[in-house]
A protein has these predicted regions:
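Structural and coupling elements of P-loop NTPases
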Residues: 1-446
């Protein structure tokens, strides 16, 4: 993969209820973009995102995966997150590194608790968002119902961009609501122009009215630019929330979504990023400017028994290079990366440099953990650490074999390095060892 400049990058987190289709959407994105020649399936335990044995055994995501997609001369760093609340720490890590979010909603199940939690996270982190409705190839899926439910909850900012064309309860095409133009699917991920069927017109009018209301809430000038396809900031500001739809299994609608991500979502340099310059004790306005002193925030750690420890970083300023000597101000330690990588699931690819705003990984950093900042000794930067949910439930654990205490302690240290919502506590008063987590499922898997 080539090196991308800051304005060519989009960092997008996939959020949503468990089972809504985030991982299968990631697979469809890989396939449609040409990064994969076939789509993995959760049922076959061969998806790029769910590479962990526990994920493959259980059939759902446990940790966040980073998957880079190349589309329309841009690099889209997809952060595929778990949908179950037990693994909320992974979601919070991903959101802290994202510049925008796609909230994934099942067209069959509709708006769920996980949808609402995703929206709240976007509000908390001030993330621009889109909604993508999956499973539109399923008989009883309803795009219109999802749009109506979203509008009832979040108001007129909900802007449907597409309407499904269905025949014999199957998704066969779509109507671009903005352009009032039909497209019919010809093969997986492929489409051609078509007439708008008469039976679609009543629903089309409803969706177009919703779109017009959303746009009218802004300004007349914006309305004109919107329908002319010009660049605008209203989606970036959260005034408009586009809604797209498709089928992950058939890779239908995914190309539209990728194009909308490039068109509507901000590159990192349009977002703010501020830290503390410990050298001068002044505020450091990084703002993902590649011309400034280099700095990066470590938002995630992965400890893999086969490939070792990787620290996932988002470059906040400057350009990171493999031969850099970096400084961890929090740990008062120098770090020598040696090599830089981009990760696709658990597969590292070496790169020569990472521009401000990009997401990558560094192997085997000795003193660096999740939440740390890497910069240079001449310009020592610290960024505020992500505010993670606190573990609230616990279970007692016992070391089976005498003499294995050190082994267990080391294993727990590795687990807690990866998972910020796990916490081991030695209750000396009651002479017991406790492991805290976010729920029974979380503790069981740990």
């Amino acid at each position: 993969m080539k090196v991308y400049r800051t304005d060519e990058i989009r960092n997008v987190v996939l959020l949503g209820h468990g089972g809504s289709g985030k991982t299968s959407l990631t697979e469809a994105m890989l396939y449609v973009s040409g990064a994969a020649n076939r789509m993995g399936k959760i049922s076959e335990a061969n998806t790029v995102s769910d590479f962990d044995k526990e994920e493959q055994k259980r059939g759902f995501s446990i940790s966040t995966s980073v998957v880079p997609i190349e589309w329309e001369k841009a690099k889209i760093n997809i952060l595929d997150t778990p949908g179950y609340f037990d693994f909320v720490g992974e979601v919070e890590e991903a959101v802290s590194a994202a510049d925008a979010a796609v909230i994934v909603v099942s067209g069959k199940a509709g708006v769920q608790v996980g949808t609402e939690k995703a929206w709240e996270l976007c509000d908390k982190y001030n993330l621009p968002r889109m909604v993508y409705v999956t499973e539109m190839d399923v008989d009883d899926a309803s795009f219109r119902q999802v749009v109506e439910d979203l509008t009832a909850r979040y108001g007129k900012k909900i802007a449907p961009h597409f309407q499904p064309i269905r025949e014999n309860e199957k998704l066969v095409g779509y109507i671009n609501v903005i352009k009032n133009a039909g497209r019919r699917y010809t093969d997986i991920g492929q489409r051609e122009e078509c007439e708008i069927p008469d039976y679609c017109l009543p629903n089309l009018q409803i969706l177009r009215d919703s779109l017009m209301e959303a746009v009218a809430e802004t300004s007349e000038e914006f309305m004109e630019r919107y329908f002319n396809g010009e660049e605008f900031s209203e989606v970036m500001d959260g005034d408009i929330v586009p809604v797209a739809m498709g089928s992950n299994i058939q890779a239908q609608g995914v190309a539209n979504l990728l194009s909308d991500i490039v068109r509507f979502f901000p590159s990192p340099d349009k977002r703010k990023c501020v830290g503390l310059n410990r050298t001068t004790n002044d505020m450091f306005e990084a703002n993902y400017d590649f011309a400034k002193a280099k700095s990066a925030y470590v938002f995630k750690t992965m400890v893999d028994p086969f490939i070792g420890k990787y620290s996932f970083v988002k470059v906040c300023s400057g350009v990171l290079k493999g031969d850099d000597v970096l400084y961890n101000a929090g740990a008062d330690a120098e770090e020598k990366p040696g090599k830089l990588y981009t990760m696709c699931g658990n597969k590292p690819t070496e790169v020569t440099e990472l521009f401000a705003g990009d997401i990558g990984a560094i192997a085997k950093l000795a003193s660096t953990k999740t939440g740390d900042t890497l910069s240079t000794k001449n310009t020592q930067i610290l960024y505020q650490k992500t505010d993670y949910s606190s573990p609230y439930t616990y279970m007692r654990y016992v070391v089976k074999n005498k003499g294995d205490e050190d082994k267990v302690s080391q294993a727990l240290a590795k687990m807690m390095a990866e998972d910020v919502t796990l916490k081991a506590v030695n209750d000396s008063e009651n002479r017991q060892s406790l492991l805290y987590g976010m729920g029974d499922q979380h503790l069981e898997i740990a």
